[in-house]
A protein has these predicted regions:
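A conserved acidic, glycine/proline-rich C-terminal tail/linker
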Residues: 113-114
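Exposed extracellular interaction/assembly regions and N-terminal maturation sites
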Residues: 20, 24-110, 119, 123-125, ...
Length: 146
């Protein structure tokens, strides 16, 4: 997120970063640990292809149905455009929950390399997807868990 779109506020001894336009919390730096503010996107279909904005919301729940399915990540160009100011070597992450009754395979779109191709997320299992920016419009997705 571009710095001009962020407002920082000291409140009750913690530093909060908010969206400058809506004042929606983005991240809080407190005395104990970092606090993230996440948005849940729910997909009810065999195959899911959430948008870059939905991935950046932080949590994808997927009700996989009627046979093995896929979770297709957004293209590198779309992800790069959605995360303004992300430098090479920086990461973004998303928590993924397969709450359906089918196994799901994480699949790549253009500009994305899945580090552990073929890794699946079994029924009622979860994974953390970490996207490492390696060049403009180019990411490696690390699939941790499940």
């Amino acid at each position: 997120m571009a710095m001009s779109l962020v407002k920082s506020i000291w409140e009750s001894g913690v530093l909060r970063f908010r969206n400058k336009g809506t004042l929606t919390p983005i991240i809080t730096l407190g005395t104990l640990r970092l606090h993230e503010y996440l948005v849940v996107t729910d997909v009810d279909s065999r195959n899911a292809a959430p948008t870059a904005a939905q991935f950046l919301g932080g949590i994808i729940t997927h009700n996989s149905q009627t046979g093995a399915g896929t979770l297709t990540v957004p293209t590198g160009a779309l992800l790069d455009a959605a995360v303004q100011g992300l430098a090479i070597g920086e990461t973004v992450k998303c928590y993924y929950l397969n709450r359906g009754d089918q196994t799901v395979t994480v699949t790549a779109a253009a500009g994305i390399t899945i580090a552990d191709t073929g890794q699946t997320v079994a029924t009622t299992e979860a994974a953390i997807l970490i996207f490492l920016k390696t060049a403009a419009d180019t990411f490696v997705c690390y699939h941790i868990g499940a």
